Amino acid sequence: MAASNQSEVNIGMVGHVDHGKTSLTRKLTGVWTDTHSEELKRGISIRLGYADCEIKKCETCDEPECYTVGKKCDSCGGKLVTLRKISFVDAPGHETLMATMLSGASLMDGAILVIAASEECPQPQTKEHLMALDALGVENILIVQNKIDLVTEEAAIENYNQIKEFTKGTVAENAPIIPVSAHHGANLDVLLKAIQEFIPTPERDETLTPKLYVARSFDVNKPGSEIKDLKGGVIGGSIIQGALKVGDELEIKPGIKVTEGNKTHWVPIVTKIISLGVGGKKLKSAVPGGLIGVGTELDPNLTKSDALSGSLAGLPGTLPETLEKMVIKPQLLERVVGSQDELVIEPLKTNEVLMLNVGTSTTVGVTASARADKAEIKLKLPVCADKGDRVAISRKIGSRWRLIGYGIIL
């Protein structure tokens, strides 16, 4: 069970650009996740956005009207019981930002695939995001047919049939399809009921050695701060197993790149947890579920501008090795998704450059050897990962990285 104030489950908000992921997140949480200046200017998500909400239920009203995220019942104004606190991970839908979406997928216990009723289905990144969820093992999926306020009933039914056809044979074949207008808040009660039913809180073993996927890192100090007021660097991410508490020593891998002569190696960073927080509230300890901010004693220069994102953190001496080369068992898709021409995917080749996502890290590697059942890849940036972890594999096709499958680390 998550600590009070902590979310129990992470739900990804995925889908094609401009289909309404960020608007739906805002309607459910009250938080507009596009806060980066470039995002506001361009009107699209660029980084992963995070926001929490509590699903509540009125004990006197019938289903689904009894479900809300408000402070009182939308139907009768009565008192509410809190059922569960959840975290949304809002992933970018633009094709150039696929690496960011893939790094977010590793944090997701379930996902909401947002599809606009006002456009033909599937759009390129609708396909690519669904394949990514499949490749990275995210199975609990809901489909939101958004923007139903913009189409006629006939067009909405036709779009629904397109969605059913598109998801046939995929991990989302039996996913509920919920028509919603995020703009008007229509049918959100039905969506909340479906989240409760179809995206359960995973069973967590808090006795395992803790591991935290680092998705963001920051310098929280304002320019011109007095030296006595300076705070250590902050990392943000999700605990995937075990528990961390204030005062614990924390090791972060791969760490810092050190060059001696003409040789380069990576040195893990060891620090101390000064604070744990979620949504502006302090915690004494944190367990899996939701997105956690970890205050440390690190020089903020090491954490600024997401410098440590993609790292793995845990207790000193418990983390897996840092890999500079990786041996994987590849599982490739049949065709390239996300592009207009759905080309047949050829097997991996020796000396091919690939983009790999494992956990929250994104790296590029060159295949040293490639067979159908085994590939060895030399990494440009090392990763800290365990045997058995899933790796998303992307190949450069034209000017874009395209998801071509996944691999299991051997």
From Swiss-Prot:
State the similarity comment: Belongs to the TRAFAC class translation factor GTPase superfamily. Classic translation factor GTPase family. EIF2G subfamily.
> Which cofactors are named for this entry?
Mg(2+)
Give the CC-aspect GO terms.
cytosol
Q: Per the record, which residues fall in region G1? A: 15-22
Gene3D superfamilies in the cross-refs: P-loop containing nucleotide triphosphate hydrolases, Translation factors
Alphabetized CDD domains for the sequence: eIF2_gamma, eIF2_gamma_II, eIF2_gamma_III
Write down the NCBIfam families for this protein, in alphabetical order: eif2g_arch (TIGR03680), PRK04000.1 (NF003077), small_GTP (TIGR00231)
Where along the chain is GTP bound?
18-23, 146-149, 181-183
tr-type G domain residues: 6-203
- Region (G4) spans which residues? 146-149
The EC code for this enzyme is 3.6.5.3
* Region described as G3: 90-93
What does the annotation say about its assembly with partners?
Heterotrimer composed of an alpha, a beta and a gamma chain.
Task: Respond yes or no to whether keyword GTP-binding is given for this record.
Answer: yes
Q: Which terms under GO biological process does the entry name?
A: formation of translation preinitiation complex
Q: What does this protein do?
A: eIF-2 functions in the early steps of protein synthesis by forming a ternary complex with GTP and initiator tRNA.
Q: Where does the record place the region G2?
A: 43-47
Which organism is the protein's source? Answer: Methanococcus maripaludis (strain C5 / ATCC BAA-1333)
In this chain, Zn(2+) is annotated as bound at: 58, 61, 73, 76
Protein name per its UniProtKB record = Translation initiation factor 2 subunit gamma
